[in-house]
C-alpha cells in the first residue's frame, strides 16, 4: 500500500498545532493528538511498516520517548526486535553513550552495548525530525556497535529546521509522513 494524498492529509489533520508552546514564538506540532485517534495511529504504523516490509530490516531503534510509541509497533509488524535509545541511567545493562547539542547546553543518549549486532540493518524511528541532533546521536550509537542504519523514519518533518540535511551528511536517508514548516 502506497500512501495516498487523502491518507496523508488525514494524518496531517490529526496533528494539533499549539501556538506559543513551550515558549512564545514556537508553533508546537503535537503528535499526541494523532495517538488519540486510533485510525490515524494505526494508519501511521501501517504506512511505515509497508514502506520497510521488504527492506531486510533486522532491528528498529526508537528514541526516547515518543519514538518508542511508533518504533515498537513498527518492529512488531516487521517481525524484528525493538531497541530503545534512552536518556542517561535509564537502561539497566551495560551501555554506551553519545552526547548531542541542545539549544542551551548538551544532553546524552544511551543504548545497551548488546542491543545491536555487527551487520544489523537498522531502521531508526522517531515522532518528529527538527534539527536532527537526537537522530544524529542515535545513528552514531548504532554505528559504534557495528549496525548499518538503513533509513530514519518520522511521522513529522519540520522541513525548514535542517534536520534532513544534517542526516543526509551522515549518509542517512530520511522518510516522513507529514511535512510542516518549523517555527
From Swiss-Prot:
An annotated Gene Ontology molecular function: adenine phosphoribosyltransferase activity
Annotated catalysed reactions: AMP + diphosphate = 5-phospho-alpha-D-ribose 1-diphosphate + adenine
Main localization category: cytoplasm
Subcellular location: Cytoplasm
PROSITE patterns: PUR_PYR_PR_TRANSFER
Function: Catalyzes a salvage reaction resulting in the formation of AMP, that is energically less costly than de novo synthesis.
Subunit structure: Homodimer.
Name of the protein in its database record: Adenine phosphoribosyltransferase
GN (gene name): apt
